[in-house]
Amino acid sequence: MEHRIYNSNYFLDITIPYFFHPEILIRIFRRHIQDIPFLHFLRTLLYKNKCLNILNIENFFYLKKNQFFCFLWNFYIYEFEYLLNDIWEKFYKFESVFFWNFIDKTNSIKKIKHILKKSKKPIEKKIVKKISSIHYIRYKNNLIITLNDRNILILENWKDFFLIFWQKYFNVWFKSSRILIQNFYKNSFSFLGYMFRIESQIILIQIQIINLLRNVNLIKKEFCSIIPVIPLIRLLAKEKFCDVLGRPLCKLSWTTLSDNEIFERFDQIIKHIFSYYSGCINKKGLYQLQYIFRFSCAKTLACKHKSTIRTVWKKYGSNLLTSSIFFNKTKLISLNFSNKNPYKKNFWYLNIIQVNYLAHSLQKSKLLKE
């Protein structure tokens, strides 16, 4: 996707609301389940407590006792994505029908005939224009949709589509402020703890024609993933690793641990951060975070032994937390990669099975702002 997404200049940033009425779930289950007693039982269960009239997923998403409601939320999102995929397939097969006629699958043929007989407006070609590819990314309730089209009018039509989609199918008045049209070149978007944007790079090429030597500027687009250093420093300040300006602090709550446990905790944090943000080309922000953890670890040890940082450097060496097996492995991989390919490129670790804690906190703070 990194090599294809730069074909588009705009993208849709959609935030699905965490709050929804339980009756919506009952209507969704009614489409798939014909067991009426089960539907009555589900309605009774959801309406038993008054505070569940509007479900707040954020409050019980990680609690074991609320696994049933997590299942309902996942089923709710699954229904949304399944129907959206079905509409997209029909939309690209039948160009002679408005896209909102496919929103409700119940008696869709009768409704389409009824609409087409009464509607005398010509079908707009811009609305039914095909697009070569659609990139759909979702994490929880945050959606990023990009189209391989540089016309902003196409995205405005898709924004109207989503507003009608939520209104007709889920009976929800979706706020237009939750669907934002962003420009890749002007606005960088935050997703899963990364900052993404498209940058234009000018490459100078010399062309020699017999006795003439001409310089040609080639503009190359590159999809860049950036480490959000300032938001990460703010999160580290909340965890008491540093202050707001990024100056390392002593982790007082860890001074009761042994030296090996302190080393293991700091080393584990740095290892997870380096693994998660290894896909970024510019590693300057990572080394800044590594500097904060190194000095925070040294200050924690100095506070524990009631000594100075210089004493800690003499005892454990100035390369504190940088001599582990993980960092030697990353240096070896990056060295071999640069020898094979002289150009500056990024590589991803494929053994990441969960989102980093700091990245998850950044994503959560973004959703709370919206």
UniProtKB/Swiss-Prot annotation:
Q: Name one GO biological process term.
A: RNA splicing
Q: Which UniProt keywords apply?
A: Chloroplast, mRNA processing, Plastid, RNA-binding, tRNA processing
**Gene Ontology CC terms:** chloroplast
Q: Subcellular location, in the record's words?
A: Plastid, Chloroplast
Molecular function terms, GO-annotated: RNA binding
Which cysteine pairs are joined by S-S bonds?
none
Membrane-spanning parts: none
Which InterPro entries does the record associate with it?
Domain_X (IPR024937), Maturase_MatK (IPR002866), Maturase_MatK_N (IPR024942)
Q: Domain of life of the organism in this record? A: Eukaryota
Family, similarity comment: Belongs to the intron maturase 2 family. MatK subfamily.
| PANTHER family reported for this sequence | MATURASE K (PTHR34811:SF1)
Chain's role: Usually encoded in the trnK tRNA gene intron. Probably assists in splicing its own and other chloroplast group II introns.
Any idea what this protein is called? Answer: Maturase K
Q: Which gene encodes it?
A: matK
